[in-house]
UniProtKB/Swiss-Prot annotation:
The keyword Lipoprotein does not apply. GO terms for molecular function: squalene synthase [NAD(P)H] activity. Disulfide bonds: none annotated. CDD domains: Trans_IPPS_HH. Pathway: Steroid metabolism; ergosterol biosynthesis. The chain crosses the membrane at residues 420-440. It comes from Aspergillus fumigatus (strain ATCC MYA-4609 / CBS 101355 / FGSC A1100 / Af293) (Neosartorya fumigata). Its EC number is 2.5.1.21. The lineage of its organism: Eukaryota, Fungi, Dikarya, Ascomycota, Pezizomycotina. This is Squalene synthase erg9. Coiled coil: none annotated. The keyword Repeat does not apply. Its main location: endoplasmic reticulum. PROSITE patterns: SQUALEN_PHYTOEN_SYN_1, SQUALEN_PHYTOEN_SYN_2.
């Protein structure tokens, strides 16, 4: 949207504007990156981090200094791998050995790759990959070992997928294949990140023993993206929804995008959402095992965005027409909720689980299972943070408000006050700008008296001889 369209939108959605302003003005990072002590190659790495992903760049750059550079190098290494895998112009005989041997290039001084097509988005990262290698070699041995191990696993997984796509069919057939694909492209990131957290003593070592927890962290994000991007992927000739699911609802995958099959398509998307929701409980469990605030923020923000995106996509026909995203104001509100504490984050999850449950319909073949999945999220949160204690029950009987309820009422009153203030301020701005524009028009000779006479006659358009006159 343009500036004028944005201004018009936020006049009618002031609460979203308030969330954006709160995040932009009052958000204080737990840690701030200190560029004064960085080498030139490190600065180049952070430049590429900004170019490859603004969202991940923002959360990575707020990490504890101990993990700041290791996580940046980890992300750029996997992004380089992904850039090779995504480029369909690279033949399999070149791509496969590159992917399988990418872990080894991390030890080769000066290595780079110029074989990507010119339009490839992150081509320049690989052209200047020697900067990443230089900084990789300066990391602690334990961090280097984690990055190399995950790079090897992901490279082999991507190579297997590329070979299958070239020799057979790139589409995903079974739910098991779907989970395996998501594991290679996202679950391994969860494993690597967890190992880095534990190595830095910012995560509970027990997280490494519960592989299903960090696996779910990655799969929940990846599956949400696959659900949201179904139209975009289809237009690009890619198909990630497993045939085992969509074949229950339509004959051919492309039938999902036909208007006459809309109800079947919605039921299919509901089953995809259900498949993703089953990871939510384990994600919440994982987040409880993080010990450092910036690491918690790093993990919590994407997860809260994912549950909000699932709620947006659930039984929403728009996903079969275009790529949809949560609103910017809602995203800012979620980021504020995800950077405070576990209880507030869990409440955000509870809110969106209830939204999904509310939109659920008995017409959906998965109605019961979706209800159970939402209830499991509620039950888990209630187990960790009970909503009612004996003291709370007694207070309710007496009609007294708890401190939390009083604080919530105060914040709601403050929000209403802020919203009214912003609406009044925007009204004043509109009036002021209108007066200034009218004043300028009058100063430069505008005849408002003649315009008024024409309006009184019922003429709301200029005379025909003026409209048709050539300038």
């Amino acid at each position: 949207m343009g500036v004028a369209a944005n201004a018009f939108y936020y006049i009618f959605h002031p609460s979203e504007l308030r969330s954006i302003l709160q995040w932009k003005i009052w958000h204080n990072p737990v840690h701030e990156r200190d560029e004064s002590n960085e080498s030139e190659t490190a600065k180049t790495c952070f430049k590429f981090l900004d170019l490859t992903s603004r969202s991940f760049s923002a959360v990575i750059k707020e990490l504890h200094p101990e993990l700041l550079l290791p996580m940046c190098i980890f992300y750029l290494t996997l992004r380089g791998l992904d850039t090779i895998e995504d480029d369909t112009s690279i033949p399999l005989e070149t791509k496969e050995p590159l992917l399988r041997g990418f872990k080894d290039v991390l030890e080769q001084d000066g290595w780079n790759f110029t074989g990507n097509r010119p339009e490839e988005k992150d081509r320049e990262l690989l052209v200047q990959f020697h900067n990443v290698i230089t900084e990789f070699k300066r990391l602690k041995p334990a961090y280097k070992a984690v990055i190399k191990d995950i790079t090897e696993k992901m490279g082999n997984g991507m190579a297997d997928y590329c070979r299958k796509a070239a020799l057979d069919d790139a589409s995903v057939k079974t739910v098991e294949e779907y989970d395996l694909y998501c594991w290679y492209v996202a679950g391994l990131v969860g494993e690597g990140s967890t190992r880095l957290f534990v190595e830095a003593e910012f995560g509970n070592p027990a997280l490494l023993k519960r592989t299903e927890l960090y696996k779910s962290m990655g799969l929940f994000l990846q599956k949400t993206n696959i659900i949201r991007d179904v139209r975009e992927d289809f237009d690009d000739g890619r198909q990630f929804w497993p045939k085992e699911i969509w074949s229950k609802h339509v004959t051919n995958f492309e039938d999902l995008f036909k208007p006459e099959n809309r109800e079947a398509a919605l039921n299919c998307s509901s089953e995809m959402v259900l498949n993703a929701l089953r990871h939510a409980e384990e994600c919440l469990f994982y987040l409880a095992g993080l010990r450092e605030q910036s690491v918690f923020n790093f993990c919590a923000i994407p997860q809260s965005m994912a549950i909000a995106t699932l709620s947006l996509c659930f039984r929403n026909p728009a996903i079969f027409e275009r790529n949809i995203k949560i609103k910017k104001g809602e995203a800012c509100q979620l980021m504020m909720e995800s950077t405070q504490n576990l209880r507030i984050l869990y409440e955000a999850f509870r809110r969106y689980a209830r939204e999904i449950h509310k939109k659920n319909t008995p017409k959906d073949p998965n109605f019961l299972e979706i209800g159970i999945a939402c209830a499991k999220i509620e039950k888990f949160i209630e187990t960790i943070f009970p909503s009612q204690s004996a003291e709370e029950a007694n207070r309710r009987v007496l009609g007294q408000k708890s401190e939390a309820e009083q604080e919530k009422a105060r914040l709601e009153a403050e929000t209403r006050k802020d919203v009214l203030f912003m609406m009044a301020l925007m009204g004043v701005i509109v009036v002021f700008v209108s007066i200034v524009m009218i004043g300028f028009a009058w100063y430069f000779g505008a005849r408002f008296d003649l315009a008024w006479q024409e309006l009184r006659k019922g003429n709301f358009r200029p005379p025909k001889h003026l409209r048709d006159r050539e300038l």
